[in-house]
Amino acid sequence: MSEFCQKYGYDIVVTSTWRKYPEWERCLRNAGLRSGIKIIGATSLPTKDRATEISDYLSNHPEIETYLVFDDDESLLKNKNDDTSELGTLFDEKGVHGDNLILCNKERGFGEEEYTMAVATHLSLKYRNANNVSTAPLASADAEGSIEATIELLYSVGELSTSLLQRSFKIGYGRAATIIDSLTEKDIVFVENKNGRIKYKPLLEYEEAKAKI
């Protein structure tokens, strides 16, 4: 996981919706334990308190340059009545740079199933410019590179699961197999179910089942 984060340039993941997304909570916790990634959880705090906790932490850790914020509250980034934001105002006050802040948020057009895709979109190097700022469209499930990055992330932290893949991807066997082959040395294959979604099976199990047909 540490190699993955170095590759994609992320030092920290900040999330305030872990309890709503248990699969990602487990994934992120495992990632933190295995790589030393700094993770902040502020699930139960009000918006202003969450913003304060995040900005305080980052102001005390200037070495952290890029961070993700998971939150369902749009006002954390932008208030309804003007262009200011809880985080933006506090960042200015505390001297925290916000150029690399990424907010993943339901109000921006995606639901629980697409959280995986949104993260992967932002982790893709294809959407990072010369200043190391993400230019990826938020929550674009079809964004080039997002599926590959998601699978790589899940595989790297040992969380490549049938349920996550079935919920996150609607792609055919050929595309999925091509992506996964480069990561798993062909020890996992993807098969498309009757609903058009995919699941994975160990290669040996798949070949044995296929031979019986």
Regions found by a protein language model. Name each.
Residues 5-26:
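Substrate-recognition element of Asp-dependent hydrolases with the DxDx(T/V) motif
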Residues 136-213:
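Terminal-proximal interaction/regulatory segments of ATP-powered molecular machines
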Residues 1-3:
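Short catalytic helix/loop segments, enriched in acidic residues and glycine
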Residues 18-21, 74-75, 206:
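Short, internal active-site loops enriched in acidic
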Residues 26-131:
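C-terminal cap/substrate-recognition subdomain and adjoining C-terminal extension
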Residues 10, 33, 188-189:
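Short aromatic/hydrophobic-glycine micro-motifs
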